[in-house]
Amino acid sequence: MKPADWLILQRKVRFGDCDSAGVIHFHNLLKWSHEAWEESIEIYGIPYKDIFPDFSIRKSQIVFPIVNCEANFLAPIKIGDFLKVKIAPHKINTHLFQVNSFFIKNGNKVAEGKIIHCSLDIDSRNKIELPDQLERWIEASNVSTNLKEC
């Protein structure tokens, strides 16, 4: 499997994604950014429940709250647009990682998102090291190559 398989995803803009002006509602860009990295880890081979557990089934000891996020709109994104979503994850330190998302329409970057997550122990709420499987996904993603494409 090549990094492009889990780092370059597709999205079609639907009616419900947009506001009355026919462009995407601002909050959807961050939602799509998060959904892109969720989909990416699944394609890479990390079981969804290992990162986003169902606490009614089993209690995970790690949670990944968002500690910072931002979105930049560079051009209108409208109903019916097909977008390529390129993600670029990287490790900030032992307990923080960032996922950048680039939204491409017809070869042009139209938006970008950034989400930073912190790895915490669920009981103590102390910072803990990122799990090995998440570190492997970040390393395998070869962020420098992915960023050059955007």
Swiss-Prot record:
HAMAP family according to UniProt: DHNA_CoA_hydrolase
InterPro entries per record: 4-hydroxybenzoyl-CoA_TE, DHNA_CoA_hydrolase, HotDog_dom_sf
Taxonomic source organism: Prochlorococcus marinus (strain MIT 9215)
Family matches, as CDD domains: 4HBT
Pfam families listed in its UniProt record: 4HBT_2
Active site: D19
Protein name, per record: 1,4-dihydroxy-2-naphthoyl-CoA hydrolase
SS bond list: none
